[in-house]
Amino acid sequence: MNKKLNTLLRYSELIVYKTYADLRAETERTYLGFLWWVFEPILYMSVFYVFFGLLLKQGTPDYVPFLLVGLTAWQWLKSCLSHGAETILGASGLMQHVFLPKVIFPIILVLTDTVKFLFILVLLFIFLWWYGYSVNITYLALPIVLLIQLLFTMALVFFLAAVVPFLPDLRFVVENILLALFFMSGVMIRSDIVPEAYQHYYYSNPIVILIESYRDILMYNV
């Protein structure tokens, strides 16, 4: 364990620089630059709100913030997993010429997506305050939930990134698994509509716990 930590510390500057370089390269590939980090999730969330909140009339008075909190947390996880699964496989060519620890590539990917997530999180705060949800003492628990999700996401990305080089076909399965998880993780529905007989299975999904924790902190002051 100490050896692995020392390795990470030794390459920490490279990790930070590569994260910055990837973010900068991404902004330079489009005219709007980093604004796409904001516009893309807003468009994504708008589609779900129009379809489920307006057309299907699934909403309640607080359905908009309810949906946005769930989608914000979900998108962070989904982005890291869908992009992170191929990080080691994609860097195999580079590692043949330069010795680099495999572990740094998933870390760089997760850090890159986390920076973009933080932009969206700030916008979510602004929206919630505008909508009438005030800052309260429960916000002190938010860093703990964020850290738990970061560690949970990192663990899943490490696993996928390590397995995909040996089972390349798995990368095509990941997106379908994420789609299934999306509908089973309480992003769009309230837990009270889940039948009592299935509540145990519903809450055995750790993503449900994370998303409900965000809502408890940001919306319900719990």
What are these regions (language model features)?
Residues 1-222:
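Hydrophobic transmembrane alpha-helices and immediately adjacent juxtamembrane helices
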